[in-house]
Amino acid sequence: MENQSLIHREANCLSRFDRLPVKSEMLKIIAVLAAVSVVEAFDLGLIGQTVLVLKQIWNLGPAETGLLATCSTIGVVLGTFSCGFLSDRYGRKRVLFWAVFIFTVFTFMGPLMENFYWVVAMRFLSGLGSGAVFPIPYLYISELVGAKQRGVTFAYCNSILVLSYVLPSSFGAWAVATFPLEVAWKLPFLVGG
């Protein structure tokens, strides 16, 4: 009988939460999460343009080109796996802050490296941060937004993320057309960092 009362109270609490309106504080948090997604998407997408330029400048073979193109994705996978454990242990806000810090610093350091292997290392470490960032906005939305607005909010945030993947390619194409290749490959990293 006592268990039923506890379950009933929890169900009432959840249904009350779902009826709460979206307030300005929630919108601010969602806007920050969307901005983080834009920066993360830029960071992940910048390698597509960069790998073609570095292949030409550094005379990279197929194995090196493949490693450069995938090293950040490998980092993302490992970072995503660690996100849940770290968020439960240290809190989502703290993990989000440090993950953004990690991918920003290592992205910014990428063009400062003049060696292929150091650039690969920077991209891998940046990917670890990006991977830890990726699930957190979805977790926050599922907790902050009531059931009636949750689907629309997910759709908006996902649309922003997907549209943001266009930014690094556009910026990279402009940089390659405007600057010498030795400079052009560095610019997306500096902007993304």
Predicted features along the sequence, with ranges:
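Transmembrane-helix signature of 12-pass secondary carriers
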Residues: 1-193
